[in-house]
């Protein structure tokens, strides 16, 4: 059941992930006028996506359908396959982190402002969050999530703990690279 899967996610890791193709789409999170959302599980190793379709009917969210599909392949490097490798192989990861890496974080002297700076590769390995390797979750609020998109944003959001990391990826010469990292945890 969805509840059991969600509880498993919460128990295994105290955060969930969201995927976006572009920054503007991140504004859709929390839109109270929405009447439909999809909750997605992306299974990295099997390259499958399980999607739960919910509709808001008379104020209540109702599960309308469940769909399971393979993730499309094209001539470019597939993001899910890339991310599975990136999350589990530090040597591969070191080849796919742009140097210098753009870094945004909260100002330690002022919680209400952010610092924009850069990290070198060693600093990335010191600051990086634990990355999900088995599966990604996604709540689709209406944002595009195109398998062929040249950019992907992976948000890791804590459940009741203030954790917030955002990883920005883009395709460069057909290969994915991490080019920006945000840690705005509180």
Which residues are covered by each model-predicted region?
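Hydrophilic extracytoplasmic domains
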Residues: 128-186
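Mature extracytoplasmic domains of secretory-pathway proteins
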Residues: 110-131
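Short, small-residue-biased leader/transition segments that mark boundaries at the very start
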Residues: 3-10
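Short, hydrophobic/aromatic-rich segments at coil-to-beta transitions
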Residues: 30-40, 147-156
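Short beta-strand edge/turn micro-motifs at domain boundaries
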Residues: 38-74, 162-186
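Extended alpha-helical surfaces
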Residues: 96-99, 106, 140-145
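Short amphipathic beta-strand and strand-loop transition segments with alternating hydrophobic
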Residues: 15-29, 138-144
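Surface-exposed beta-loop interaction hotspot
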Residues: 55-95, 103-115
């Amino acid at each position: 059941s969805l509840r059991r899967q969600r509880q498993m996610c919460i128990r295994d890791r105290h955060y969930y992930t969201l995927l976006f193709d572009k920054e503007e789409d991140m504004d859709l999170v929390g839109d109270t006028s929405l009447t439909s959302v999809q909750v997605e599980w992306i299974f990295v190793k099997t390259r499958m996506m399980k999607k739960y379709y919910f509709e808001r009917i008379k104020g209540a969210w109702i599960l309308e359908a469940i769909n399971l599909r393979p993730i499309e392949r094209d001539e470019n490097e597939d993001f899910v396959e890339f991310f599975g490798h990136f999350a589990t192989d530090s040597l591969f990861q070191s080849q796919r982190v742009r140097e210098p890496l753009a870094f945004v974080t909260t100002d330690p002297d002022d919680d209400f402002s952010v610092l924009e700076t850069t990290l070198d590769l060693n600093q990335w390995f010191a600051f990086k969050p634990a990355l999900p390797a088995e599966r990604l979750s996604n709540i689709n609020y209406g944002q595009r999530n195109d398998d062929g998109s040249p950019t992907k944003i992976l948000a890791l959001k804590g459940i009741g703990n203030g954790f917030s990391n955002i990883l920005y990826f883009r395709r460069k010469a057909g290969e994915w690279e991490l080019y920006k990292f945000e840690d705005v945890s509180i």
